[in-house]
Amino acid sequence: MTDRESSRDKGRQAEELACAHLRRQGLATLGKNWTCRRGELDLVMLDGDTVVFVEVRSRRHRAWGGALESIDARKRQRLILSAELFLQQEARWAKRPCRFDVVTVDTSDGQSPPRLDWIQNAFDA
């Protein structure tokens, strides 16, 4: 297994942990790893009447910065554009309120299970 495959697998594991956590909080899954020409939406969830676009960030080493800090303006713009395309293609959700959340998965101290933080309304569109 290459480092890239290993990182991808760890990213998918973090997304599964985040999805399970959000489902326990009452959210329903609308989509996972939704891709388009603009990028990818890790999770698309429904929280009551609100469509929630979730970016999952995982960090093993705090020296590289926190997971939330890794979402720069360019990444936010790609997420917003991807969400717009999702709503165009999935018109049944287009008239609902939307928000962008982030779930951070922290494995930096070797905790088992990893620490998850759910940041609602992490940024505005």
Swiss-Prot record:
Superkingdom assignment: Bacteria
Record-linked SUPFAM superfamilies: Restriction endonuclease-like
GO molecular function annotations of the record: nucleic acid binding
Any Pfam family hit: UPF0102
Matching PANTHER family: UPF0102 PROTEIN YRAN
Similarity comment text for this entry: Belongs to the UPF0102 family.
Protein's name according to its UniProt entry: UPF0102 protein PA4424
Organism: Pseudomonas aeruginosa (strain ATCC 15692 / DSM 22644 / CIP 104116 / JCM 14847 / LMG 12228 / 1C / PRS 101 / PAO1)
Origin organism lineage: Bacteria, Pseudomonadati, Pseudomonadota, Gammaproteobacteria, Pseudomonadales
